Amino acid sequence: MKTQHQWWEVLDPFLTQHEALIAFLTFAAVVIVIYLYRPSWSVCNVPGPTAMPLVGHLPLMAKYGPDVFSVLAKQYGPIFRFQMGRQPLIIIAEAELCREVGIKKFKDLPNRSIPSPISASPLHKKGLFFTRDKRWSKMRNTILSLYQPSHLTSLIPTMHSFITSATHNLDSKPRDIVFSNLFLKLTTDIIGQAAFGVDFGLSGKKPIKDVEVTDFINQHVYSTTQLKMDLSGSLSIILGLLIPILQEPFRQVLKRIPGTMDWRVEKTNARLSGQLNEIVSKRAKEAETDSKDFLSLILKARESDPFAKNIFTSDYISAVTYEHLLAGSATTAFTLSSVLYLVSGHLDVEKRLLQEIDGFGNRDLIPTAHDLQHKFPYLDQVIKEAMRFYMVSPLVARETAKEVEIGGYLLPKGTWVWLALGVLAKDPKNFPEPEKFKPERFDPNGEEEKHRHPYAFIPFGIGPRACVGQRFALQEIKLTLLHLYRNYIFRHSLEMEIPLQLDYGIILSFKNGVKLRTIKRF
């Protein structure tokens, strides 16, 4: 029979190993806790709801959708903390604070923070939108020079041609049409011509049945729809939201496993990049001196400017050109769909709008750029109110480049600061009865417009990082609406849901489309 000393000799190595395992597990748990919660500790002085472990406040987003920030702003005030998984966001929901972040302290917050859907996609990451620091500044200066008023004016005939071609089939008997799809095809065709010098042929009388073109557009649509900001994206994107350190290792593994969403996204982005590179290479060899599309102008700028040559390498040219395709199609189509949906439900607005449009002149008269800017004040109000009602980009991302004070809170370097433009647009202090569609609230002679904070409505962003293509987009929107309302009126389809459901991603989209009944006026 073993003595007590002998038993201790037997158990001692086991206890030592057991203690070592406990120590290791304890250390690992501490490291994990520090990793998961350290970002939020640095901004714990900013008010906000209690975050759930790992997922943060994502369940609130699932519950409230895009309205989650309005709900939290009412509870916590104009500046509050929101946890996107592990990553804390400082949400700015007040117009003056937005001006402070976007303009007054722009040098302290010059870059956009890069969320996990973008960090996994070089094609999106290398565009103007997410490029950073000096490269962004040089890219922006070159691109801005391409958006001169004279160039935009020269695009009116091209835009008008695509618009009339896309709507030719509306002349038949009244029928229901999914306008969100029609507008996406139309805006893709217009920006394809303006950005690439390519006619995709999606919206014409006889759509081009080109396999390469169709494949390119399908890849474009799929790539865009995967930019999710919730837990419905690929596994690597979900991990990027919850545990960012695991995103890239898992993406590298999953993109090699056929059938996974990461594999499909990787394959799609690779094909898109390859197709874009072919377009860029072909256009560079052609060197057409008379071509005025965006890609040709960028290539010319690269050849004439040594600085531009270093900035606009082939991969960045492909990314910027593709970015124009995305920004110039999905967002514009969303706004056009919003206008038709809202106006068709407000006959008093429709009546006044038709009176203004009919008063311009003959239905075949193509408006000039000056006409578009000065002859349609009520149309301007309708567009603004639709953009307020359905803000296509309800959040604008920034990141602190150094320690900075915002709204009385000291934020460390690297803090993600997001401007809640969607909250501003529904704030009753600036927009009384915000849930009502009232275009006259944007009447420059009205009291509401006069007393509103100048940065309460900023649908194209704010400061130097604002959308460079906003004049292009507004010109396209006005031309399209003028042509449509000169010839048709619209009514809600009985098959369409009311209210419309939204998909929440990098930009908003209508989950099930906008379906309307088309009625010819004459």
Swiss-Prot record:
Family per similarity comment: Belongs to the cytochrome P450 family.
Note: The branching phenotypes of the max1, ccd7/max3 and ccd8/max4 mutants can be rescued by exogenous treatment with the synthetic strigolactone analogs GR24 and 4BD. However, the max1 mutant does not respond to carlactone (CL).
Name of the gene encoding the protein in the UniProt record: CYP711A1
Record lineage: Eukaryota, Viridiplantae, Streptophyta, Embryophyta, Tracheophyta
UniProt keyword annotations, A-Z: Heme, Iron, Membrane, Metal-binding, Monooxygenase, Oxidoreductase, Transmembrane, Transmembrane helix
Binding site for heme: C467
Keyword Protein transport assigned: no
Name listed for the protein in its UniProt record: Cytochrome P450 711A1
Record's bilayer topology term: Single-pass membrane protein
Cofactors that this protein relies on: heme
Catalytic activity: (11R)-carlactone + reduced [NADPH--hemoprotein reductase] + O2 = (11R)-19-hydroxycarlactone + oxidized [NADPH--hemoprotein reductase] + H2O + H(+); (11R)-19-hydroxycarlactone + reduced [NADPH--hemoprotein reductase] + O2 = (11R)-19-oxocarlactone + oxidized [NADPH--hemoprotein reductase] + 2 H2O + H(+); (11R)-19-oxocarlactone + reduced [NADPH--hemoprotein reductase] + O2 = (11R)-carlactonoate + oxidized [NADPH--hemoprotein reductase] + H2O + 2 H(+)
Membrane spanning stretches: 14-34
Organism listed in the record: Arabidopsis thaliana (Mouse-ear cress)
